Regions:
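Signature of extracytoplasmic/envelope-associated structural regions
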Residues: 1-44, 55, 59-87, 91-93, ...
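Structural beta-strand segments of beta-rich domains
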Residues: 50-52
């Protein structure tokens, strides 16, 4: 008999435009339900909406699948759509199984909400799937299936024999983790830190390499209406374009389809936008010398900069388990939405690969594809919803070699540390799920939001001491830095000078690629690489570095280092970072 096997399971992820708004669409041939209901939105609805206000809810029922927006395919779509289940209806307000991922405009009298009956083929449409990224080479995953707080209650009475009288359900907690995955690229690194913006030098401002877009774009948008005239740069399928050039909201996408005209129509992007963009220019990725677009076979370097933000973006996870007989109709799919990656560790040790782990990820809720429970009267399983089954052929499996510890470099207080044996960098946002009073339908009792608290960084380093001669020169040592406590004032003036701390740089390099540039991840502490005295300016400080006498030779020290912030820069051949 067919069974579910660990080596036939995959976990993929994707950034959400709004908390809980998992990203996917529905194909054009998703059938409207017979004479099913349809209506139009009454007012604009932002991404992250948990309910819809419509002009007429007549004909809709709890449990119905509804399509919000319009059908799409590669030749006719001009806006985003998505499918959600109806959880409750009050008047003309429809409550949804999960928040929306996209902005949906007022219908204005034109129907843009439809009752639909998705087929198996509709839910295996590779063109509609976006939750298809792999964090790295992982082996095990703690999935965030709900933890049910069911408690027995003791009431006054004479027949319970000291046992509880009745059990009641409390809150639901969704917490998971992915430990120790090998870093194949830097896409997993930004989530406990903040935003990522991408750029390349292969753009310029000549007319032939620019194209306007007619209207402002929102975070999450997949479709871009082209402005300008037919004499402007044509955007063909596979053309890469940059939005927000020269800013910290710059991002690069690839055109996957062109609707109506490559010069005056609408293009569809390979992934949703991560930032809002005012109407303006987008720049074509091309060779600066010839003002021509890059050939699809040409590899060019992209730089991805990760910087701190107060609010963290949320992610969706999709768990796809294919049975051993490979019958896709029996696949077991679960999706977790609204996840905040609150803590992460980046580590490496001699002889191994550099790894990362998402140590604590809290989610808002989940959906799955196990529709009915076989009881005397079949009931719909709680949290069931129609969704895309993320198939293997659509998953963006990295083809890169991993980053190796032996190809890295660590510098501290201006010195390259030659004898690092291991390092472990930890980030914690101390996030807390909050359970506010809110109208939740069905059996939902999960968090209403997840809030970040104080952010904390630390770095643990194990290193062998330098040669004895170096310890008696002007070269600064770990022991000296520990005693200085980051204060480099004179013996008589150190109080007024104040603490400064020192800079740390961790560089991970992956050999030369075909074009001659190196894939590289650079972690800079503090974020600007320039520790200084004063608030929000300090660098790193050694808290402990005991020079114990052990059996290790040469002499080995384990240092614990505190620092206040960092930035990460990644250079590789990936145009898109989520």
């Amino acid at each position: 008999m067919a069974v579910y096997r660990a080596d036939q399971a995959q976990v993929t992820f994707m950034t959400e435009p709004a908390a809980g708004g998992y990203v996917e669409q529905a194909p054009k041939d998703t059938a409207k339900t017979g004479s099913g209901a349809d209506t139009d939105l009454d007012g604009n609805h932002e991404a992250g909406s948990t309910s819809l206000t419509v002009t007429d809810s007549t004909g809709f029922s709890v449990g119905d699948a509804i399509l919000i927006g319009y059908w799409h395919d590669s030749t006719t779509a001009t806006n985003e759509n998505e499918i959600r289940q109806i959880e409750h209806i009050t008047g003309n307000v429809i409550y949804l199984s999960a928040p929306t991922a996209f902005y949906h405009a007022d219908g204005g009298g034109t129907d843009n909400v439809f009752e639909v009956t998705p087929t198996t083929a509709n839910l295996q449409d590779a063109d509609s799937q976006y939750i298809n990224l792999i964090p790295g080479a992982y082996e095990t995953v703690d999935v965030p299936d709900p933890e049910m707080a069911i408690e027995g209650r003791w009431f006054l009475g004479t027949t319970s024999k000291r046992a509880f009288y009745a059990a009641y359900s409390g809150q639901q907690t969704y917490a998971g983790s992915i430990g120790g995955f090998a870093l194949l690229d830097g896409k997993a690194l930004r989530y406990p830190i903040g935003k990522v913006y991408s750029t390349t030098t292969f753009t310029n401002d000549v007319t032939a390499m620019k194209r306007t877009f007619a209207a402002a774009l929102k975070k999450g948008d997949l479709y871009v209406a082209l402005g300008g005239t037919s004499s402007d740069a044509a955007i063909a399928v596979t053309t890469k374009v940059m939005f927000g050039r020269g800013s910290e909201t710059s991002e690069i996408r690839q055109s996957t389809s062109v609707l109506a005209s490559a010069s005056a129509g609408t293009i569809r992007l390979d992934y949703p936008l991560q930032f809002d963009h005012a109407a303006g220019d987008m720049h074509v990725i091309g060779t600066a010398a010839s003002n021509t677009t890059i050939a699809t076979t040409q590899t060019i370097p992209y730089t991805h900069s990760i910087k701190e933000t107060v609010d963290l973006d949320s992610v969706s996870w999709h768990v796809h388990m294919l049975p051993s007989d490979e019958t896709r109709a029996n696949a077991f799919d679960r999706r977790y939405y609204g996840g905040k990656i609150g803590s992460m560790t980046i580590s490496g040790e001699e002889g191994g690969m550099v790894t990362a782990s998402w140590d604590g990820v809290n989610f808002l809720g989940m959906i799955h594809n196990q529709k009915t429970v076989d009881l005397s009267t079949d009931i719909t399983t709680p949290f069931f919803a129609d969704m895309q089954s993320i198939i293997n052929s659509k998953v963006d499996f990295p083809t890169n070699e991993p980053y190796y510890f032996s190809q890295g470099e660590v510098t501290m207080f201006g010195q390259t540390i030659a004898r690092i044996r291991s390092f472990s960098l930890s980030i914690s946002n101390n996030e807390e799920p909050r359970y506010y009073i809110k109208k939740q339908m069905g059996r939902k009792r999960g968090p209403t939001e997840i809030r970040e608290q104080r952010r904390e960084y630390s770095l643990a380093v194990t290193l062998a001491l330098p040669d004895a001669a170096a310890a008696n020169t002007a070269q600064r040592t770990l022991f000296q830095e520990m005693l200085l406590e980051g204060n480099y004032g004179s013996a008589t003036d150190f109080i007024r000078t104040g603490k400064k701390g020192f800079d740390v740089s961790i560089t991970l390099t992956r050999g030369n690629v075909v074009t001659g540039f190196e894939d590289k991840i650079t972690i800079t502490i503090p974020d600007d690489g320039a520790a200084a005295t004063g608030g929000n300016q300090q660098g790193a400080f050694i808290r402990t570095a005991p020079h114990n006498i052990t059996e290790d030779n040469p002499f080995q020290v384990e240092a614990d280092i505190l620092f206040r912030n960092l930035s990460i820069t990644v250079q590789d051949a990936e145009h898109y970072y989520p």
